């Protein structure tokens, strides 16, 4: 709109003809110069007001959704149009000046000088306005760039502050955990649980408050605060749960033990009172008697009989249905007799006699062997009568031991002292048989 107004003002002088100029000169002669001057200034002020209004309307009607690049292009186009219109006006005014100099009188020349001054003022005003607009647009762009750089700096500083606050909160959490662990070791479990829970909650609140304050500075929506697990508290809670479970299991076991004892007492009472009477009592009470209950009652009666006769009871780890209590009692009696019966003095087996009379061909070896075997009397072993078979075996043993000693000595001399090859299986070993 502003460009169209400038073009109208520029094209207006083209329409003016020389006849019109002459009429103006005549009117100027008749009318005083002051009145004409005021009239011309009023028309100029009205045209300026119209231009301003049109500019304002154009600005209002522009869509806000246009991009910055489009606005820059428009400002450049407007400035180029203004320059063209100003050049066109300069050319027209120069042509008008030439005509007016040829055709005008002295009064006309004065008037044209005034017009030229006014036109030059208008041109200077339009140029200064375009410069001001350019300057304003540049200053706006600079301000925008400065504000963007400030926002970036602020965002960077905020991110640094967040990182610092997070690291501080982590360090505090670690300190809190270490303190809670050291306290929970020395204090009672029940007291430490309640105190550590209240303290941990208070510390969490204290930690969360500075976080919220630091994060509220940022325009972005703040995420929920991180609530990490307190390992010390978790361990204490797990320990408490385990203790509760152990208590429950212990109570169940105690109940089961009590029930078993009651059943055993009932079985013992049934055994003493007689199985037939017990079954009769159960039938009289109205309970259903199964064959298993009847068998258990019979076995209990047998065990009671055996206990009364022998004084030996069948242990609980045996199945009462599979073990006969009377036979078990007899076996136990025999075992006890064998264990606690004293040894008879004349009973010695042949193998015992052979070991006692063993001779290695060396007294020291014989003494060592008897000590190891627990043989006490040497004189009795020598004086006792020996059978022919035992004597032969003793002789054979002596010969075997002598041969072994000779072979060992030969092998030792060849391997260690003479340094023979291997174990000494050479022609010198043939002399071993003669020894």
UniProtKB/Swiss-Prot annotation:
User: Has keyword Acetylation?
Assistant: yes
Comp. bias regions, Basic and acidic residues: 1-27, 66-111
**Position(s) of the covalent cross-link Glycyl lysine isopeptide (Lys-Gly) (interchain with G-Cter in SUMO2)?**
376
| Coiled-coil segments | 230-270
Annotated positions of the N-acetylalanine modification: 2
What are the Phosphoserine sites (modified residues) in this protein?
4, 17, 30, 32, 104, 377
Record field: compositional bias (Basic residues): 35-51, 112-214
Q: Which UniProt keywords apply?
A: Acetylation, Coiled coil, Isopeptide bond, Phosphoprotein, Ubl conjugation
Cross-link named Glycyl lysine isopeptide (Lys-Gly) (interchain with G-Cter in SUMO1), where? Answer: 376
Xref: InterPro entries: SMAP_dom (IPR028124)
Going by the entry's taxonomy, the superkingdom of the source organism is recorded as Eukaryota
Provide the positions where the record notes the PTM Phosphothreonine: 6, 16
**Keyword Ubl conjugation carried by entry:** yes
Q: Into which family does the record put it?
A: Belongs to the RSRC2 family.
Q: What is this protein called?
A: Arginine/serine-rich coiled-coil protein 2
Which species is the source of this protein?
Pongo abelii (Sumatran orangutan)
């Amino acid at each position: 709109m502003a460009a169209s107004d400038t073009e109208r003002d520029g094209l207006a002088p083209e329409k003016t003809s020389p006849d019109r100029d002459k009429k103006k000169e005549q009117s100027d002669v008749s009318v005083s110069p002051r009145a004409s001057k005021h009239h011309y200034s009023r028309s100029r002020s009205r045209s300026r007001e119209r231009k301003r209004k049109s500019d304002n309307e154009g600005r209002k009607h522009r869509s806000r959704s246009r991009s910055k690049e489009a606005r820059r292009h428009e400002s450049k186009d407007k400035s180029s149009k203004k320059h063209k219109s100003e050049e066109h006006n300069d050319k027209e005014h120069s042509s008008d000046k030439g005509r007016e100099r040829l055709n005008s009188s002295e009064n006309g020349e004065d008037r044209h000088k005034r017009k030229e001054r006014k036109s030059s003022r208008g041109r200077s005003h339009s140029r200064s306005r375009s410069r001001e607009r350019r300057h304003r647009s540049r200053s706006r762009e600079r301000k925008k760039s400065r504000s963007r750089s400030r926002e970036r700096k602020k965002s960077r500083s905020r991110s640094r502050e967040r990182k610092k606050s997070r690291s501080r909160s982590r360090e505090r959490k670690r300190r809190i955990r270490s303190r809670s662990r050291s306290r929970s070791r020395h204090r009672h479990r029940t007291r430490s649980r309640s105190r550590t829970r209240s303290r941990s909650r208070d510390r969490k609140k204290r930690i969360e408050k500075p976080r919220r304050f630091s994060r509220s500075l940022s325009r972005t929506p703040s995420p929920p605060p991180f609530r990490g697990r307190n390992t010390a508290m978790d361990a204490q809670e797990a320990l408490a749960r385990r203790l509760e479970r152990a208590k429950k299991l212990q109570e169940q076991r105690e109940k089961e033990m009590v029930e078993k004892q009651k059943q055993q007492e009932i079985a013992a009472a049934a055994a003493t009172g007689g199985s037939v009477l017990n079954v009769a009592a159960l039938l009289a009470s109205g309970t259903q008697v199964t064959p298993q209950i009847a068998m258990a009652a019979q076995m209990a009666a047998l065990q009671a009989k055996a206990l009364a006769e022998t004084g030996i009871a069948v242990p609980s780890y045996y199945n009462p249905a599979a073990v006969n209590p009377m036979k078990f009692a007899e076996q136990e009696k025999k075992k006890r007799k064998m264990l606690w019966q004293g040894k008879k003095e004349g009973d010695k087996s042949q193998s015992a006699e052979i070991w006692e009379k063993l001779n290695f061909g060396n007294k020291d070896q014989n003494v060592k062997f008897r000590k190891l075997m627990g043989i006490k009397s040497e004189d009795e072993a020598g004086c006792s009568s020996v059978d022919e078979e035992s004597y032969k075996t003793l002789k054979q043993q002596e010969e075997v031991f002598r041969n072994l000693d000779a072979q060992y000595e030969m092998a030792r001399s060849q391997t260690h002292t003479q340094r023979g090859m291997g174990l000494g299986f050479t022609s010198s070993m043939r002399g071993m048989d003669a020894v």
